[in-house]
Each structure stands twice: as C-alpha cells, then as structure tokens.
C-alpha cells in the first residue's frame, strides 16, 4: 500500500472518516493496575522532556487538499533540534499520528539537496498565527516563535486517521506546512474551528498583528517546500527488496 492511497481496501481497521476507534477489547483491570504501578516505578525520562504543546495544521505532500489539525508535543534536544510526537488532538484518547523533526536554518543548510526536498519551512505558518503554543500568552512565546520561523521540519504521518483508518495502515506519508499560495493555504473553517475551541485569535487583528514585526528569514531555501516550485509532492511505496546477507557497517 502506498502512502498516497486514498481508499485502502476495507478491513476491520477501516471505520469511516469520523473519529475512528481502534479495534480491540476494553482495557483489562490487570492492565490498568500494571500501568499505575509502572507510572510510579519508572522515570519515563524521554517522555518527560516534552515541555510544549503546539497546535497547527499540516497538509499531505501528495494531496494538499487533505488538511488536518495537528498537535505537537515538543521535546528540545538542543537549541537547534526539536523532536515532536504528533497527535490528532490533545484528548486522552488522542492518536499518535506521526513524528516531526525540526532543525534550525543553520543545520538545514548542511543537509544534502535530496534530503532538503523532504523538509518544509515554518516562516509563513508562524507569521500567520497558525502555529501556536496552546494556552501560552503571546508575550511569553514570542521569542520562541521568532526562532521557530527560521526553522525547517520533516513530518512523517504514520496514521491517516483523517481518512478513517482505525489503525496505522500502509506506508508513512510525508506532510508539508501551510503556505500563503494556493493550494497550500489552510481552509478557513479548519482555522476557525481550532481558534474557537482554544480561544485563539489568529485573525489579522490577533496573532497575525502581534507577529507582523517579527523578523522573517532572509531567504527560504528553495529545496524546501518542494511542491511550490515543482508542482509535485512525494509519496512512499513499499516494495520487496533483497535482504542483506552481510552487515553494511563494521
């Protein structure tokens, strides 16, 4: 199955587009007891490094008309590298739909051109008020947003819940960031729904106005946001391959 499949064959893991629920039995009491005990006994250090909850929107690289609200739970490896677990909501039942890696422009410029094509810029997404740390006053997050505007991200979606997949099916799909140009502009109803739910004002008089003086990158590498210049996206397909008989590395 390709990552660009619109309608995978009907399976118990396909339940329609609205709030797909994974197949399976209710969680047993014994499992809940284990979870509670493990929570007390284990440090869960990688998970506890997630310090921010950011909400934004993402588009499928092979079909920019498929647009989804995304929730990034962000861990900072250092000032130049972030790693984000991406969920479809911030509810307790949220699905882990992918992962995004974010790097500074300095690191991005050191990547090979073929690698850069898989990444997207964040400048418009930030300046337009689409990316925001939920519940954090703009005055507190403004410096972080200014830094983020100069970054690039690579986002793989592993669970296409928006098409009704009740489990992660097929190959990962590459995602891209919203842009000002069609067809990369996020639909207004998606933004309004998000803003109403969280009490956010991303209109021209809200976050956009607050960020209008924010410095923009001197340039955005043309290898990023590949579709804008080439009119094409990327999709992943799964093909059989010969297994390696010898270790590739010493």
From Swiss-Prot:
Belongs to the OBAP family. InterPro entries: OBAP-like. Residues 1-29 are annotated as: Disordered. PANTHER family: OIL BODY-ASSOCIATED PROTEIN 2B (PTHR31360:SF17), PTHR31360. It comes from Zea mays. The lineage of its organism: Eukaryota, Viridiplantae, Streptophyta, Embryophyta, Tracheophyta. Residues 8-18 have a biased composition (Low complexity). It holds the Pfam family DUF1264. This is Oil body-associated protein 2B. It comes from the Eukaryota.
């Amino acid at each position: 199955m390709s990552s660009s499949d619109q309608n995978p064959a009907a399976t118990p893991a396909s339940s329609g587009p609205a709030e797909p629920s994974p197949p399976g039995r209710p969680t047993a009491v014994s499992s809940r007891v284990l979870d509670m005990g493990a929570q007390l006994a284990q440090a869960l250090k990688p998970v506890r490094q997630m310090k921010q909850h950011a909400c934004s929107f993402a588009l499928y690289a092979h079909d920019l008309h498929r647009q989804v609200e995304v929730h990034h739970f962000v861990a900072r490896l250092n000032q130049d590298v972030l790693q984000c677990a991406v969920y479809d909501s911030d509810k307790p039942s949220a699905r882990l739909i992918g992962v995004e890696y974010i790097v500074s422009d300095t690191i991005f410029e050191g990547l090979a051109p073929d690698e850069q094509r898989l990444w997207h810029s964040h400048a418009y997404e930030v300046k337009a008020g689409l990316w925001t740390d939920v519940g954090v006053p703009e005055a507190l997050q403004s410096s972080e947003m200014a830094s983020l505007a100069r970054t690039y991200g690579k986002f793989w979606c592993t669970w296409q819940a928006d098409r009704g997949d009740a489990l992660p099916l097929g190959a990962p799909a590459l995602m891209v960031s919203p842009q000002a140009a069609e067809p990369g502009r996020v639909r207004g109803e998606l933004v309004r729904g998000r803003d109403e739910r969280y009490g956010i004002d991303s209109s021209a008089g809200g976050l956009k106005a607050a960020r209008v003086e924010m410095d923009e990158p001197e340039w955005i590498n043309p290898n990023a946001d590949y579709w804008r210049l080439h009119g094409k996206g990327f999709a992943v397909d799964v093909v059989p391959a010969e297994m390696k008989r010898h270790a590739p590395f010493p």
